[in-house]
């Protein structure tokens, strides 16, 4: 078996320990490395000629990306997981206890267990490269740093900074890491090893005192002040997680106990809490999402098809969506973009939108003005079809008007090459209808982005019956280069995400008309785990947008999609939501901090607001509609698998990640239980709650999706 760790000795007495996991592009920590590391440490301790040790990666752009997450699935009990954490503690404690200076030379990803390894070293130096990022993202998998991170990080950078890193999972850039005391130096990659060797030769040095604000000095320097920090962090966590995620509270407890009772006690608490989280249903769900997205990155979207390289893109429409799509194409994919709009104003807006996003990076010192300007230079504009002939893909982001989209298809087929892909960003019109205007329908596909484009990770790649496999594969690859998570769905009204969202939103509107208050409804679904409530979402998306989509779904998919009368009443009062400052909530300068309901909306709807229904019951009524429709989409072949359905719902509409997605959640509930709930509502409210056939079959046969 090939070794992962290689120890070499220099003439100056410094030993270099290189980590290079055989056959993998990135280093990850595995349980089986324990004996190998212990053997090397014993060798180092027994050699009096070794004056210092430098730990470095043999990978091109990765220090250590973290622990191998698949190890956790092998843990059948909390005891197994605890033993895993304790094994890490033993190795890292042994490294830290070496009498010679130990320096971590970091280039590339230094995350999770990788950062915990670096923290066990006496000093750290990292490259100034953009690929170098440091962090402890375990909380995003429903876990905590289980290799001593909850103890060493607060002692190095301070309690407040450490809690911020661990509770958010944020990744830190090199200069920021130096400023906060996480690393001792930042240098160009070309002299990284040399600098680390010089640090080791200089011997162990006491860490520099952390620069803290006066307030932080007072708070962190006394037990009374520290209690204030921990109590405040707990309140913020409870507000943010609504009690749905156990990891943040356990992270706070690890730090609290470690600071109060000492490092050894802190490590014991860390191992116990880590073990409990590993076997929790929340972490299992979050890890399933991680594995699903990792698996999807290896797929082309069309079996056996090879994607063509996209060297140039054209965006039709300079509005909010067009500007956003153009922006991610230049900034993320680094692909030249030509934006075409009928008006100079639309083009100016698209350029301004892209510049504003890039300038944020400059202001936050994530990029230089020169880099911003070079990326902006990739974007050019036109009011006519000039400079579009060599486009490999054209993304259409114009109004939801079929005749207009037909004209766009004809224009592109006339002006561009025979292999140019026409990708429509329609949110509701079937792609087959758009392709009716094409002489090359195999090049027509849907590419449905979500707003705001630069923030929302999902795109739906929609294939109609005649879309070629090569077109699908090329579009999927293009979306990935934009930093998106694409799921391939088949053609049909509403596709997948908007289809399952529509019934959820309709049910919320129905509950509103039954007299439930706006705040009560929104709070109920936020408590369930959604990032925002359905009424807030309706205001953000636009009440007029919802009203346009509903008739299309109603016509194509049937009576259950018929929108409640609320939409017509609201639009009759010119309420479109945030976009025109008039919706369910108040908008304006005074409403920025505390969002208040516009009480006049109740008069428009003809209701008296009430909070008389249980929050769990409200959430259940909305969510079961979404679950039922998700299974219908799977049954009809709209989505290829339960995995894709889970990813689409989580990344497209914020379905609670700790539940793992609609299909994982159905497995948790049990199909028989869900059918029973749906039939109960069907008897009360009618056939819109009728369970789909597949759910009934699953209930009878007692089967699950995973």
UniProtKB/Swiss-Prot annotation:
According to the record, the residues making up region (3-hydroxyacyl-CoA dehydrogenase) are: 308-706
What InterPro entries does its record include? Answer: 3-OHacyl-CoA_DH_NAD-bd (IPR006176), 3HC_DH_C (IPR006108), 6-PGluconate_DH-like_C_sf (IPR008927), ClpP/crotonase-like_dom_sf (IPR029045), Enoyl-CoA_hydra/iso (IPR001753), FA_oxidation_alpha_subunit (IPR050136), FadJ (IPR012802), NAD(P)-bd_dom_sf (IPR036291)
Chemical reaction(s) catalysed: a (3S)-3-hydroxyacyl-CoA = a (2E)-enoyl-CoA + H2O; a 4-saturated-(3S)-3-hydroxyacyl-CoA = a (3E)-enoyl-CoA + H2O; a (3S)-3-hydroxyacyl-CoA + NAD(+) = a 3-oxoacyl-CoA + NADH + H(+); (3S)-3-hydroxybutanoyl-CoA = (3R)-3-hydroxybutanoyl-CoA
Q: Name one Pfam family in it.
A: 3HCDH
Enumerate the UniProt keywords alphabetically: Cytoplasm, Fatty acid metabolism, Isomerase, Lipid degradation, Lipid metabolism, Lyase, Multifunctional enzyme, NAD, Oxidoreductase
Task: Extract one GO BP annotation from the record.
Answer: fatty acid beta-oxidation
As recorded in UniProt, its EC number(s) are 4.2.1.17, 5.1.2.3, 1.1.1.35
Instruction: Give an example GO cellular component term for this record.
Output: cytoplasm
Where primarily located?
cytoplasm
Question: Can you tell which superkingdom this protein's organism belongs to?
Answer: Bacteria
The region called Enoyl-CoA hydratase is annotated at 1-188
Example GO molecular function: NAD+ binding
Q: Summarize subunit and interaction data from the UniProt record for this chain.
A: Heterotetramer of two alpha chains (FadJ) and two beta chains (FadI).
As for family, the record states:
In the N-terminal section; belongs to the enoyl-CoA hydratase/isomerase family.
PANTHER family tied to this protein: TRIFUNCTIONAL ENZYME SUBUNIT ALPHA, TRIFUNCTIONAL ENZYME SUBUNIT ALPHA, MITOCHONDRIAL
What's the protein called, per UniProt?
A: Fatty acid oxidation complex subunit alpha
């Amino acid at each position: 078996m090939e070794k992962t760790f290689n120890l070499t000795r220099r003439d100056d007495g410094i030993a270099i320990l290189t980590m290079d996991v055989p056959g993998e592009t990135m280093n990850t920590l595995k349980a089986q490395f324990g004996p190998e590391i212990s053997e090397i440490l014993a060798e180092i301790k027994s050699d009096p000629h070794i004056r210092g040790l430098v730990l470095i990666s043999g990978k091109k752009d990765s220090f250590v990306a973290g622990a191998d997450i698949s190890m956790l699935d092998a843990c059948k009990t909390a005891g197994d997981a605890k033993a895993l954490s304790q094994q890490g503690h033993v190795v890292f404690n042994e490294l830290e206890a070496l009498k010679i200076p130990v320096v971590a030379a970091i280039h590339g990803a230094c995350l999770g267990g990788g950062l915990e390894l670096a923290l066990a070293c006496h000093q750290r130096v990292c490259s100034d490269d953009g690929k170098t990022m440091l962090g402890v993202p375990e909380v995003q998998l429903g876990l905590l740093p289980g290799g001593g991170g909850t103890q060493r990080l607060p002692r190095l950078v301070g309690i407040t900074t450490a809690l911020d890193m661990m509770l958010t999972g944020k990744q830190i850039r090199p200069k920021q890491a130096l400023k906060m005391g996480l690393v001792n130096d930042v240098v160009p990659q070309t002299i990284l090893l040399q600098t680390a060797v010089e640090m080791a030769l200089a011997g162990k040095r006491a860490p520099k005192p952390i620069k803290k604000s006066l307030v932080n000095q007072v708070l962190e320097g006394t037990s009374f002040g520290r209690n204030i920090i921990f109590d405040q962090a707990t309140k913020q966590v409870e507000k943010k997680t609504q009690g749905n995620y156990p990891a943040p509270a356990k992270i706070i407890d690890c730090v609290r106990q470690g600071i109060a009772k000492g490092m050894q006690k802190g490590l014991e608490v860390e191992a116990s809490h880590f073990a409990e989280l590993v076997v929790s249903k929340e972490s299992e769900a979050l890890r399933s999402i991680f594995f699903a997205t990792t698996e999807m990155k290896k797929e082309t979207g069309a079996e056996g098809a090879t994607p063509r390289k996209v060297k140039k893109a054209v965006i039709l429409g300079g509005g909010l969506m067009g500007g956003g799509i153009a922006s991610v194409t230049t900034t993320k994919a680094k692909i030249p973009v030509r934006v075409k709009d009928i008006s100079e104003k639309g083009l100016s807006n698209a350029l301004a939108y892209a510049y504003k996003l890039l300038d944020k990076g400059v202001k936050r010192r994530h990029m230089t003005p020169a880099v911003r300007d070079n990326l902006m230079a990739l974007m050019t504009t036109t009011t006519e079809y000039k400079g579009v002939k060599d486009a490999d893909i054209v993304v259409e982001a114009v109004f939801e008007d079929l005749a207009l989209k037909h004209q766009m298809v004809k224009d592109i087929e006339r002006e561009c090459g025979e292999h140019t892909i026409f990708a429509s960003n329609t949110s509701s019109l079937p792609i087959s209808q758009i392709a009716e205007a094409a002489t090359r329908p195999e090049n027509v596909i849907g590419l449905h982005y979500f707003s705001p484009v630069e923030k929302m990770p999902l795109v739906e790649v929609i294939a109609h019956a005649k879309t070629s496999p090569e077109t699908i594969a090329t579009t999927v690859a293009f979306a990935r280069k934009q930093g998106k998570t694409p799921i391939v769905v088949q053609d049909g009204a509403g596709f997948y995400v908007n289809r399952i969202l529509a019934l959820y939103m309709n049910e919320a509107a129905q509950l509103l008309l039954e007299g439930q208050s706006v705040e009560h409804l929104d709070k109920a679904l936020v408590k369930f785990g959604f990032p925002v409530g359905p009424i807030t979402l309706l205001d953000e998306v636009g009440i007029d947008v919802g009203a346009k989509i509903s008739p299309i779904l109603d016509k194509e998919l049937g009576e259950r999609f018929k929108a409640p009368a609320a939409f017509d009443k609201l639009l009759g009062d010119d309420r479109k939501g945030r976009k025109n400052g008039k919706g369910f909530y108040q908008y304006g300068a005074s409403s920025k901090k505390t969002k208040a309901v516009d009480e006049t909306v109740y008069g428009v709807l003809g209701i008296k607001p009430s909070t008389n229904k249980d929050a769990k019951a409200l959430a259940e009524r909305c969510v079961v509609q979404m679950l039922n429709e998700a299974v219908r989409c799977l049954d009809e072949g709209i989505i290829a698998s339960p995995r894709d359905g889970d990813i689409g719902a989580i990344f497209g509409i914020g379905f609670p990640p700790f539940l793992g997605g609609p299909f994982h959640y159905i497995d948790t509930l049990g199909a028989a239980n869900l059918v029973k709930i749906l039939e109960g509502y069907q008897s009360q409210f009618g056939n819109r709650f009728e369970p789909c056939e597949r759910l009934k079959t699953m209930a009878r046969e007692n089967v699950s999706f995973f």
